[in-house]
Amino acid sequence: MNFKRLITTSFTNQIKNMKFKKTISFKPFDINNRIIYDKEPTIVFKDQKSCLLKDTISTTLEDGSKELKIKIGRFTPGLDSNNNYISSDIFEININNYSNKIDLCLNGKNPTFLRRKGKIPTKVKNWEQLLGEQLEIRKSVTLEDGDIISFLGLNGTTSSIQFTIEEDNENEKEKEKEMELDNDNTNTESIPPITSKSTSTSTSLIDTNKIQLKKHFEDPNSKNVGLSALVYFCNKPESFLDVVLYYDDKTVAVLDKYPKAKHHYLVIPRVEINTLDELTPSFIPMLEHMYNVADAIINEIISKDNDDDNLKKSDFKLGFHAIPSMKRLHLHIISNDYNTKYLKNNKHWNSFTTEFYIPFDKILNELKSNGKVKVSIKKKIKKNKKKLIH
């Protein structure tokens, strides 16, 4: 079953104030052979503000604490939707905002078992010894890292998942905050206005000798990257030189993992910011620096790419997605040929050829004029079931 990211505004609003500092995920597990499948994990809760399961509700307890109830069943990404022995609402995970406690409560009548922390006996005589303790309906148990939940089917067949619970790395977040630009000391007057018809002469501030043009990934699936990959690149770009084109103390430029054109790159700020809504006037110098890096990369491509003798600046588009597909806001540099095997469907096409793709100068000018960026297309996306997010 394909893993899909299922976030809606209502879920995000419910959990955006959660102080819970752990990430919960699970993978299918072969309990008979003690093998965890090499698949993308299903994220139950992540980053204190993202819940990837839609049947999520938030309640306030008598002591004033908030509790998040996340329902899980056979239609949850990562579980077998054809397995009738897993009900559509088999159990729920309850997260307490203040105690950081994670409880699991069985809702369905299907026989469900808990094996603590993956500790499976070497020799077992029956499936009861293998699967562990049978859970009781409506009785909560504490969920811990490594726990295996198993569902009993016909003739002793089983289906199992193993949970991973990870602490958020606060040290990395602190390091990112320390790298924020000293905007009070930045002379923005030296940077001329940037429009789609003019380019900034301050690209000379970019050391073009540091730009290393690269071909795109031969096999993107071989790269161990996920929703937080851009954060990893920013934290330690020198460790990803096969992906990184350029980096300095403010930005990192990388190859796009699934390029939607012959030339497709990302410029990422090293300061922590994830959406256009978070932009304030203090980020203007950062955006202008991102533009200068992008412009320098385009100049390098035009001057050094022998396959494109007629390539011009007008052949490139700089812009942001209205809703970023990954953690950390990033600026796209993309050529307008859209000649790539990764442009597979309408969503991919729409994400760069409709108003979902917002030009750089529109974002910068709106921020300068209004002091904030209002992404109006979000309302259209909410009403449209066929979302443009890719």
Curated annotation (Swiss-Prot):
Gene Ontology CC annotations of this record? nucleus
Q: One GO MF term, please? A: DNA 5'-adenosine monophosphate hydrolase activity
Q: Which PROSITE patterns does the entry link to?
A: HIT_2
Question: Where is the region Disordered?
Answer: 168-201
Example GO biological process term? single strand break repair
Domain HIT residues, every copy? 232-343
Mind telling me which InterPro entries this protein's record contains? HIT-like, HIT-like_sf
Q: Point to the regions of Low complexity compositional bias.
A: 184-201
Q: Specify the domain of life of the species encoding this protein.
A: Eukaryota
Which Pfam families does its entry note?
A: DcpS_C
Q: What is this protein called?
A: HIT domain-containing protein DDB_G0272839
What species does this protein belong to? Dictyostelium discoideum
